[in-house]
Amino acid sequence: MEANQEASLFLVKILEELDSKQNTVSYQDLCKSLCAQFDLSQLAKLRSVLFYTACLDPNFPATLFKDKMKCSVNNQQSKKIMVAADIVTIFNLIQMNGGTAKEKLPMSCHKVRKKEASFESCRSDTEVCSPTVCEPLNCELSERPFSRGYPTRQSSKCRKMDCKECPQFVPASEPNFLLGVSKEVKNRAASLDRLQALSPYSVASPQPCEMQRTYFPMNIENEPMSDQDSLPISQGIKETFISSEEPFVVQSCVQKRNIFKEDFHNLMTVSPSLVGTTNKAEEGHGEPQSQKELHKPPFFNHSFEMPYHNQYLNPVYSPIPDKRRAKHESLDDLQASTYFGPTPVMGTQDTRRCPGRSSKQTPWPAKSWSLNTEEVPDFERSFFNRNPSEEKLRYPNSGSQTPNFSGPDRHPVYLVPKDQQKVLPAGYAVKPNGLKSKEISSPVDLEKHEAVKKFKDKSISCTSGQHSSDTSSVGTQTEQHVLDPPKCKDLCTSGQAKYGDRHAMKQSDDDSEIVSDDISDIFRFLDDMSISGSTGVIQSSCYNSTGSLSQLHKSDCDSSPEHHLAKITNGVSSGKGDKCNRPENVHHSEEELKSSVCKLVLRIGEIERKLESLSGVREEISQVLGKLNKLDQKIQQPEKVNVQIDLNSLTSEAPSDDSASPRVFRAHSGSHGPKLENSPDWCCSDASGSNSESLRVKALKKSLFTRPSSRSLTEENSATESKIASISNSPRDWRTITYTNRMSLNEEEIKDAGPANNKDWHRKSKEADRQYDIPPQHRLPKQPKDGFLVEQVFSPHPYPTSLKGHMKSNPLYTDMRLTELAEVKRGQPSWTIEEYARNSGDKGKLTALDLQTQESLNPNNLEYWMEDIYTPGYDSLLKRKEAEFRRAKVCKIAALITAAACTVILVIVVPICTMKS
């Protein structure tokens, strides 16, 4: 007896050491402290006790520590460190309970008494007394609080006794490893599953509750003293755990895990009930409720105290006949967090509760049972008419017995009261077609329906042509609105007016009676969201010429007179919403989807009609290219031109252009917003003034977008040709050409500018011309362009004579880095017609080829960019050809010399010789 008490005190000391240093000392320091204070045999005993206690939890990895308990190490110090490390590890694993339940576990420090005293006080231990009645015991019973999250309780009517007679307790400092709480009838391995809802959700007022105690083995003499013998269950532990009175047997780890292969899922759930404080008259001498119920056999020896006041284990919330409960209660959390809500199971939906969430209101309201609001359960429908005072969660408190209220009242508040749902967020449009008429089942609902209809009438000015689905979505939360049914046919009115096929928009009555399941509702919801956008309002898809969304005040359907007529008729009949028959309400979602499809088809046809204006683009482009070729030919013609541009002729042409082409898109050169006038076709916006447009692009635009006008392409381009022909031939004036043509074309497009703007524009254009007209003496010398391009284009020879294989004379190697060196040797170039005539001495040499050379200086031409390409293969080919030419030349000279010599010999020598003879 003394040895047992000392052993218990020793284990108390070790566990208190672990408890006090767990959160303040590191793992290594805790192991060192255990090794320094205790012997190997004591540590081995504690490890075996902790191991067998931890094996009560089926989640405990027993095989990891079984090999360690069998291992034999010769060095005692190493073995001691290993045992201490195992103790700390098992202790931490027991508390963590898989890592997920640590925050939910009660942080109580219970005392475990030895078995000899437990049977003496088995009856009296179950009686609950207040702490003030009991005198403190001498064995640290009053020194340590029983709970950090619970009200302080003592387990029995305390008897005045000395410490020698006092039963010894082992404190389970964070003692959740001692609690095998999950009690199944068929000796299921004890689990810590039920503990996760105890501590953080304690009821505010102290509630005496039933004490179930799990025995903690303390017979140290009967334990094996060696570390190697500690794995098998000794006789003392067997006597401790196995008792004929109790149906609990400690099994091996393999047997514990084999229970999962059996039919343990159908075991009945034993749920200890709460004992209310109104039973205080019975508490001193009565038995708890669980002992009165004979169909609940006890599972544990009544020697370790474990208070239950878990809402989850309350039979009100956990009915015994429910055999479909999830194996792990965390599945309820998973179901409650899914988007479309939990799945109804056999009508027990209002008794399903998330574990550990009983004393909290659910932070998110319950998700909709289905997107089809016809299938709302009855208990949720009862929330529509409840008062806010009835919506408080009622839990047992110190002054009342646990009420067995019904399922709908027992549920948390899932929905906001309907009076608060009339005010919607600003970004969400009111959809006057929400709830079906069969759900408007009470006068209160009808009054709210009328109020919402009035609210809809006030906001009719912002009504769009498309309404959303039955729920307005805020995040993933679906809120239900009692809204106006008579608008159910308003959606497909425009489609019916367009196509005239009213029967295609409806289904038969047989199809309407079929209730849609969750999957079809999900897809219908996704279709509506994809068509309508997240707010359920179809954006107007009328795009202007720049591709941006035009700011129209009406949607596509509102602009049609048919839609206005249907809207008026529907508005007249909106007061008869309660008389709207049921098939129309059932057809509502299908008609809404079909009307959206009809709108989409109409929009596609609209776009196709707009695209028809591009059918003749190819022919017009060919005509434009022909005109541009004529322009090039006119530029190449030699003629005397003036340097200054005759702007008066240009201004005289501008009004005629404007009057002749009323459909041209006009915009100020500095304006920012494009304006659509009376052009039915696509019009390209020139809002920025088109300062970067080239001449050809402008001509192309003008030929494309003035096609419906009365002017022909020839008349249209004649002004452009005359303007281009009146420009100086100077390469520096090419910028003037593009600039003036750009400004003149913009001038034709300016109609709203007025005479003041026109004068200002003329002044600016003249200043720009003067800016480009620089005297020759102030111009910087540039690299001259020889006849390379002219010869390359017009020469019949494949290799022009100006192409030489030498680096300095070949224009292929003309580089910007070589320009400075080339200018020193080549002298002053001629950049104007006068300089060219003076330098060449012949004014008749100004030909179309010269203008073509200057054409190559125009950056708008492809030759300007293709001229200076470096081609080393071409250079080697040139050198080879030049060598062949030189060789042929030498051969010809040699042949001529030989022929001359032969001729001299034959003509002179032979007659002389003949004459001498």
From Swiss-Prot:
Descriptive protein name: Major intrinsically disordered Notch2-binding receptor 1
GO cellular component, one term: plasma membrane
Region Disordered, residue ranges: 337-367, 388-410, 461-483, 568-588, 652-687, 706-727, 746-783
Summary of subunit composition and partner proteins: Interacts with NOTCH2; this interaction increases MINAR1 stability. Interacts (via N-terminus) with DEPTOR (via PDZ domain); this interaction may stabilize DEPTOR protein by impairing its ubiquitination.
Topological domains, Extracellular: 914-917
One Pfam family this sequence matches: MINAR1_N
Tissue specificity as recorded in UniProt: Expressed in brain and in islets of Langerhans.
Subcellular location: Cell membrane
Topology with respect to the bilayer: Single-pass type IV membrane protein
Protein family membership: Belongs to the MINAR family.
Cytoplasmic membrane side: 1-892
Keywords: Angiogenesis, Cell membrane, Membrane, Phosphoprotein, Transmembrane, Transmembrane helix
Function statement: Intrinsically disordered protein which may negatively regulate mTOR signaling pathway by stabilizing the mTOR complex component DEPTOR. Negatively regulates angiogenesis. Negatively regulates cell growth. Negatively regulates neurite outgrowth in hippocampal neurons.
Residues with Phosphoserine modification: 712
